Amino acid sequence: MPSGCGDDADSTGNALRRLPHVRKRIGKRKHLDIYRRLLRVFPSFVALNRLLGGLFPPELQKYRRRLFIEVRLSRRIPDCVLVFLPPDSGSRGIVYCYVIEFKTTYSDADDQSVRWHATHSLQYAEGLRQLKGALVDFDFLRLPRGGGQVWSVVPSLVFFQQKADRPSFYRAFRSGRFDLCTDSVLDYLGRRQDESVAHLLAATRRRLLRAARGKRAALPRARASAVAGGRGGGNARRGLARGRAHGPGAQTVSASGAEGSGSQGTDLLRGSRRARVRGGGAVEPAVRARRRTVAADAATTTVSSAFVVPRDRRGRSFRRPTRSL
């Protein structure tokens, strides 16, 4: 590397290191927030592409995707590596790999600010240097005699304003083509992810799964409580209706009818008692009225049956002779 390039790189790095520590901490938190959101929207190509400002062409929607965060390559540690594999697992089509560097800024970045803004231009130059080093690392993974699968590696820069949800500026540069062994490279990228970030993202993924399970489990509990409340209210209403039907206006019945009504009254009392327990004591006055009605019916029936005198067809009374044993 020429000495001038090295001096420019050192001056750029030193200038960015002189930024306030508060700004650096905010930038790190923003990076972690971007990683979490990537995990959240990764299953949906549309949401993933929207998060990155439309970086990917729509033809990649049918491709299978793999996501790697902060991969430690030999020279650089790119923030994100997104691999798009052909739709058919046995296909020998081109693999598209996006090596992405995220830059967080205090103000919105655009095509002009990355040229003239002091901080934006330094971040842009640093990102170019990092992406160039990542391409050199992929060149080291090239198969010496060919025979592998063609990878199109696309270096990309994405600028996020620190309080924004979508990028303010992105740029995809000319891709480099490499003949690589796909399975070996995917395994290499997976093993070279930063462990601390991987653990943090795994904890985030577990929290998202628990939250989703909690939402699904809360719905059956609400339905069960609603069904139980409906049953208790229905029993209470039925017990109240029965108590009103057998109030003080009930007529005197015969002895056999009194016996049946007594057993029926007992069942009604039991049902009303159960309804009172379930319904919260709303039918207590009806139960007490029903008890008094059943007792009065039994007493009236007993007195009436004691004075019944047998009569013949003409209405004359007679007594049956008793037989001695």
Swiss-Prot record:
Disulfide bridges in this chain: none
Biased composition (Low complexity): 247-258
GO biological process, one term: symbiont-mediated arrest of host cell cycle during G2/M transition
Induction behaviour: Expressed late in the infection cycle.
Keywords for the protein's UniProt record, in alphabetical order: Host cytoplasm, Host G2/M cell cycle arrest by virus, Host Golgi apparatus, Host nucleus, Host-virus interaction, Late protein, Modulation of host cell cycle by virus, Virion
Keyword field contains Ribonucleoprotein: no
Record region (Disordered): 222-286
GO cellular component terms, A-Z: host cell Golgi apparatus; host cell nucleolus; host cell viral assembly compartment; viral tegument
Subcellular location: Virion; Host cytoplasm; Host nucleus, Host nucleolus; Host Golgi apparatus
Major subcellular location class: virion
Keyword Isomerase set for record: no
Domain of life: Viruses
Function (record text): May participate in nuclear egress of viral particles. Plays a role in the dispersal of several host nucleolar proteins including NCL/nucleolin and NPM1. Since deletion of host NCL/nucleolin negatively impact on nuclear egress, UL76 supposedly acts on this process through its effect on host nucleoli. Induces cell cycle arrest in host cells at the G2/M phase following by apoptosis. The mechanism involves the inhibition of host mitotic complex cyclinB/CDK1.
Family: Belongs to the herpesviridae UL24 family.
Name of the protein this chain belongs to: Protein UL76
Organism: Human cytomegalovirus (strain Merlin)
